A protein has these predicted regions:
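Short Gly/Thr-rich strand-loop-strand
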Residues: 12-23, 86-132, 172
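Short, surface-exposed coil-to-beta transition loops
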Residues: 62-65, 129-135
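Surface-exposed amphipathic alpha-helical segments
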Residues: 148-173
Length: 173
């Protein structure tokens, strides 16, 4: 799906990411990254399970962060999706400066695609030779599917990964 036969699972994700970072537009953090503590704070989520995948080593051409976040009810998950959509739309067309772990990056957001139960947005890193990410978020029952698919030729990979996870959640009913 990502165009790489050598991607392997890496770090399992079991909690929200509380990495200290600064964004020039703080409300774009959820449109930029998956499973962020600042984004999920106060949402009522009850659990998180995720995984990071890439080629081996630190010099990879493909990177995916995928997470499922559970809520006590479908209504709470849907409310989180609606809030996320509103924030993501406010990031569209804007460039955000991110300072993370002592490094500064600039990302430009494209327009948000889709509407609940699934949304996505493409963001492109400036000065990174075409490195871009598709953020995708979907809701299925009481679960938020939170995806970030990055590489040099990203089209709809985040969306397709989200669809596969939604199908699994829907089959568990």
């Amino acid at each position: 799906m990502m165009g790489s036969a050598t991607m392997t699972p890496g770090k399992a994700i079991t909690t929200v990411d509380n990495t200290a970072m600064t964004l020039s537009i703080p409300d774009c953090q959820g449109a930029m990254y998956t499973s962020q503590g600042a984004v999920y704070a106060g949402s009522g989520y009850t659990g998180l399970s995720g995984l990071v995948l890439s080629e081996p080593g630190d010099d990879y051409d493909h990177w995916v962060n995928q997470a499922t976040i559970s809520f006590p009810t479908a209504a709470k998950a849907e409310a989180f999706m609606d809030t996320s959509l509103s924030k993501w739309k406010n990031c569209a067309g804007k460039t955000v400066t991110v300072t993370n772990k002592g490094k500064t990056y600039r990302w430009t957001f494209h327009e948000v695609d889709g509407s609940p139960p699934e949304i996505s947005v493409l963001d492109v890193q400036e000065g990174a030779n075409g490195w871009e990410c598709q953020r995708a978020m979907a809701v299925a029952n009481n679960i938020i599917i939170d995806i970030n698919a990055c590489g040099y030729q990203i089209t709809d990979q985040g969306h397709r990964i989200a669809d596969k996870i939604v199908a699994k959640v829907d089959n568990e009913d």
